[in-house]
């Protein structure tokens, strides 16, 4: 009996010790900056232009938008007047609160004005790539139930079927003196009808913070593109997390000229550039597309202070000898986002912009901004090369084990999860995909693998589904790509998995050689394989002209895997 009691006591004690060893709470990471008050009860346009109303300190006569293509300038007063007129014009055509308007436009002042007008009306903008094919446009327009499409004259032929189905087409052309002329296309409404509408005809709509304001399309962590419902509250929160407060994480000021050649239909340019610039009273220099010499000429002419980039753009700056011909000394911030920038590229671009603070940010369409370098803060922190920043203020982040879901401490890699008011409301008409992405506790699972170091800085290792499994070992493509790009005869590279009967998967490389290079497969394999452990060695190399990438700069690995499958089946 005594022995049984002792055994019971020892067993109970061991169980208690085991319970004490298990983590009793999540490892949750927050910003080094204190949380701030965010007025996310306001409609988006009220918030963005708050400094120009009431007791605000903004000067409406200052420059808001510079059209890089024509030199046309719009002041903050011009932008707000046009916003209200276009909203009234859209309303006159039958668009109401909650209706969806597709913006099928390249970077232009009209894109910005249209987005703001739709938001002011309480309607929803779904943004689309103007280079989409007719079927791609139709698929998004129908899935989003768009009632109107605002586009350019040269794109109208892609919209014939939609026009026949009753979708209103508003058309602009940028060949006129003022940047917009009437369309002569039958069945299309001229954009000038909107800009000349009587704003007094529209009573300001009542907008809830939970109303959807933007609906870009994203594949998320997997699957087909889905409509991402971003609310007024979510977008206001995402902007404020970056640029509001006494010590903003991203210190844009009214004296800045912010360059925008990254596509405005993508959330990065829309949120972190266009709307953040307007919130702070800065000037936004809009360029239709990235052309290296034109961009450098505009930097010199307008004394641009902020240049946001993506990895392909950084590569262009690094590899071009033309950079020496231009005065780029006005640039004080170079912000890399949309895709993780390798340390080798970061170090190289610093030499081209000697006066610029360089750092990275990290986010996704569904989550808003997740992290931002504190090197950009008004009172900056020391940061490490290669880090994508620290978690944004007024938000929480954790790193979870991909197998168990248990949260991990510092310096342990796992899936990055984020929680906060900046998150999307969900995917349009897809509750299952929403539930897979945002769990019951409100954590959005990004599908990105990373870790938080001892200084709260975040490092992205790879994408969850992009990891290569070699006999159970994890191989990160990003690591091998960094090595490949460091070779002087390689312009760009991507690594994907190839099926293998013995190892399950092996890494293979697609390589874009420098012009005139005679680099061979053996040269590439030798260069990489001598620098990595055996299971990370490149097994095959395929030479191609260009690495396929999305407009965001992310490698289109699905395309490369399909190409690999075709080549291996021959």
Swiss-Prot record:
GO BP field: phenylpropanoid biosynthetic process
Designated gene of the protein: 4CL4
Region (SBD1): 291-360
Family statement drawn from the similarity comment of this UniProt entry: Belongs to the ATP-dependent AMP-binding enzyme family.
Catalysed reaction equations from the record: (E)-sinapate + ATP + CoA = (E)-sinapoyl-CoA + AMP + diphosphate; (E)-4-coumarate + ATP + CoA = (E)-4-coumaroyl-CoA + AMP + diphosphate; (E)-caffeate + ATP + CoA = (E)-caffeoyl-CoA + AMP + diphosphate; (E)-ferulate + ATP + CoA = (E)-feruloyl-CoA + AMP + diphosphate
Record bears the keyword rRNA-binding: no
Cofactor: Mg(2+)
Chain coiled-coil ranges: none
InterPro entries xref list: AMP-bd_C (IPR025110), AMP-bd_C_sf (IPR045851), AMP-binding_CS (IPR020845), AMP-dep_synth/lig_dom (IPR000873), ANL_N_sf (IPR042099)
E.C. designation(s): 6.2.1.12, 6.2.1.34, 6.2.1.-
Biological source species: Arabidopsis thaliana (Mouse-ear cress)
PROSITE patterns: AMP_BINDING
Binding sites annotated in the UniProt record for (E)-4-coumaroyl-AMP: 268, 338, 360-361, 365, 465, 469
Residues annotated as binding ATP: 218-222, 226, 360-361, 365, 448, 463, 554
Positions of CoA binding: 289, 471-472
Induction (free text): By wounding.
Function: Produces CoA thioesters of a variety of hydroxy- and methoxy-substituted cinnamic acids, which are used to synthesize several phenylpropanoid-derived compounds, including anthocyanins, flavonoids, isoflavonoids, coumarins, lignin, suberin and wall-bound phenolics. Follows a two-step reaction mechanism, wherein the carboxylate substrate first undergoes adenylation by ATP, followed by a thioesterification in the presence of CoA to yield the final CoA thioesters.
Pfam families listed in its UniProt record: AMP-binding, AMP-binding_C
Protein name in the entry: 4-coumarate--CoA ligase 4
Lineage: Eukaryota, Viridiplantae, Streptophyta, Embryophyta, Tracheophyta
């Amino acid at each position: 009996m005594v022995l049984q009691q002792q055994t019971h006591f020892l067993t109970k004690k061991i169980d208690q010790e085991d319970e004490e060893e298990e983590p009793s709470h999540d490892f949750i990471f927050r910003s080094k900056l204190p949380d701030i008050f965010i007025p996310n009860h306001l409609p988006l346009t009220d918030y963005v232009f708050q400094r120009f109303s009431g007791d605000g300190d903004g000067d409406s006569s200052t420059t808001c938008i510079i059209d890089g293509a024509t030199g046309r300038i719009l002041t903050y007063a011009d932008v707000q007047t046009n916003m209200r007129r276009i909203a009234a014009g859209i309303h006159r055509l039958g668009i109401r609160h909650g209706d969806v308007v597709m913006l099928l436009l390249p970077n232009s002042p009209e894109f910005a004005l249209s987005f703001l007008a739709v938001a002011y009306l309480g309607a929803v903008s779904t943004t689309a790539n103007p280079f989409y094919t007719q079927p791609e446009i139709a698929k998004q327009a129908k899935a989003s139930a768009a009632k109107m499409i605002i586009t350019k004259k040269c794109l109208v032929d892609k919209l014939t079927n939609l026009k026949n189905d009753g979708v209103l087409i508003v058309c602009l052309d940028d060949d006129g003196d003022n940047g917009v002329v009437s369309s002569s296309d039958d069945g299309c409404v001229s954009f000038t009808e909107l800009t000349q509408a009587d704003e007094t005809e529209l009573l300001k709509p009542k907008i809830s913070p939970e109303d959807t304001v933007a609906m870009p399309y994203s594949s998320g962590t997997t699957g087909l593109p889905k409509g991402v419902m971003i609310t007024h509250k979510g977008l206001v929160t995402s902007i404020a997390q970056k640029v509001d407060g006494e010590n903003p994480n991203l210190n844009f000021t009214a004296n800045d000229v912010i360059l925008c050649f990254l596509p405005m239909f993508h959330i990065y340019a829309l949120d972190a550039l266009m709307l953040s610039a307007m919130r702070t009273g800065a000037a936004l220099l809009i360029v239709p597309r990235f052309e290296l010499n034109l961009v450098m000429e505009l930097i010199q002419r307008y004394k641009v202070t902020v240049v946001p980039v993506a990895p392909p753009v950084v590569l262009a700056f690094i590899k071009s000898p033309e950079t020496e011909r231009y005065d780029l000394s006005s640039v004080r911030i170079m912000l890399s986002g949309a895709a993780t920038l390798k340390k080798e590229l970061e170090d190289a671009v610093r030499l081209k912009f000697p006066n610029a603070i360089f750092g990275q940010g990290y986010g996704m369409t569904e989550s808003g901004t997740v992290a931002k370098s504190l090197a950009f803060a008004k009172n900056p922190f020391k940061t490490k090369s290669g880090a994508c920043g620290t978690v944004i203020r007024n938000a929480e982040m954790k790193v979870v084990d991909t197998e168990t879901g248990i949260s991990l401490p510092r310096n342990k890699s796992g899936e990055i999860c984020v929680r906060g008011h900046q998150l999307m409301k969900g995917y349009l008409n897809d509750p299952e995909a929403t539930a897979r992405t945002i769990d019951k506790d409100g954590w959005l699972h990004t599908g990105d693998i990373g870790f938080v170091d001892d200084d709260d800085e975040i490092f992205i290792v790879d994408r969850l589904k992009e990891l290569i499994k070699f006999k159970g070992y994890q191989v990160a493509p990003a690591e091998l790509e960094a090595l490949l790009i460091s070779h002087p005869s390689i312009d760009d590279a991507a690594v994907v998995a190839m099926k293998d009967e013995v190892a399950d998967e092996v890494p293979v490389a697609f390589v874009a050689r420098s012009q005139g290079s005679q680099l061979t497969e053996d040269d590439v394999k030798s260069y990489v394989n001598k620098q990595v452990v055996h299971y990370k060695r490149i097994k095959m190399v395929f030479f191609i002209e260009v690495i396929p990438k999305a407009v965001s700069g992310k490698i289109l690995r699905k395309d490369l895997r399909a190409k690999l499958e075709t080549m291996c089946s021959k």
